[in-house]
Amino acid sequence: MNEHIDTTCVQGGYQPGNGESRTPPIIQATTFKYRSSEQMSRLFDLSESGYFYTRLQNPTNDTVAAKICEMEGGAAAMLTSSGQAANFFALFNICNNGDHIVASSAIYGGTFNLINVTMRNMGIECTFVSPDCTEEELEAAFRPNTKAVFGESISNPALIVLDFEKFANAAHRHGVPLIVDNTFPTPINCRPFEYGVDIVTHATTKYMDGHGSCVGGAIVDSGNFDWMAHAGKFPGLTTPDESYHGVTYATEFGKAAYITKATAQLMRDFGSTPAPINSWIMGMHMESLGVRMERHCANAQKVAEWLNADPRVSWVSYPGLEGDKYHELALKYMPNGTCGVISFGVPGGREKVSSFLDHLKMVSIATHVADARSCTLYPAGTTHRQLTEEQLEEAGVGIDLVRLSCGIENADDIIADLDQALAAVQE
């Protein structure tokens, strides 16, 4: 039966048997008991599936990963301890010293740092391109050693909608996968695999948890990218892994090869696994994701329209606005809505922007987005503080930009708070 995604939010990933709990149980355990040392050996050889140590896998984590996988329409998925870990694993799983990445310049500041500084120090180079680049400019960014293309479905905080098909076509012409962070719209509003994206990541900390209570991340593989067709580019997947007695992931695990390698190698070596209690809580919160996203988007639409009509605001960026530069792309890829985050400009310089934030009462200042409580931030002074003026411009983050995450409160109360804060900085 083909069920609606709202139903998958509730029912996905877990089907209880007769007499079993209707809600997924929590397996808060580090290790698992076996009666046979031979069976344990098979687990370590990857010749048999099962659990032996939560640093690699845990039943609770896998249940929630399966739910997200179903929602995205993927072939395999895994959870990580944070969205940052998810993006790192997604790239490092196929990139090594001497390799190259093409990435959209309009991405979260922490991810920009990960790619531009940390991974560069590991010998992995990156060419950043504007999400608005022409096909010719995008083609020029590729090198013979390019292994992946990365972007965000809706960029944080500039709210630029990525043209999936343009980036996917370029990636596939060069025999590499397109990896997209789908945190902001969630699979409720956007299913990137339907438009040629190969791998999706999430900061589940955001809308999926939705209550500011659990840090986490997820990686979902569509199973559509043919690693063996480009075997020379991806030896980690297409040649024997010495650390697992010569297993070749692409031939042994098929559509699950990418996630199996990330679990067996990267989780083993980096240990970025979420605590089962965090996954369990997040899984419970995901049951209301469809309902919450509808409210987040409705609130953001109403607030964005109000801001757009207010002369005290210099500009508003929200893909749901008809006049927004990315409205047509949003209608194409996210016809049911975008997200609950708005960016807008408060004129007068950094001090004026900071003063506006300081005058807010209900809307809190927080390094967060996408939970039940409305919050705001000044990205140029916080999340993107490490970027140069030129890099800020490339990322679409001006010095007047305010990021507002609309919660699920009454939209009129959000507007009233913004109104009084704008009035205060005019005095």
Language-model features: locations:
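PLP-dependent enzyme catalytic core of the Aspartate aminotransferase-like
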Residues: 116-117, 125-126, 140, 144-147, ...
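Short, solvent-exposed beta-strand edge segments and adjacent coil->beta transition regions
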Residues: 48, 337-341, 399-403
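Conserved PLP-enzyme active-site core in the AAT-like
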Residues: 6-15, 77-310
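N-terminal "arm"/small-domain region of PLP-dependent enzymes with the aminotransferase-like
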Residues: 1-58, 66
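Conserved N-terminal alpha-helix of the aminotransferase class I/II PLP-enzyme fold
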Residues: 36-88, 110-118
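Conserved small-domain helix->loop->beta segment predominantly found in fold-type I
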Residues: 270-273, 277-279, 284-288, 293-295, ...
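Glycine-centered tight turns that cap/initiate beta-strands
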Residues: 73, 145, 312-315, 362, ...
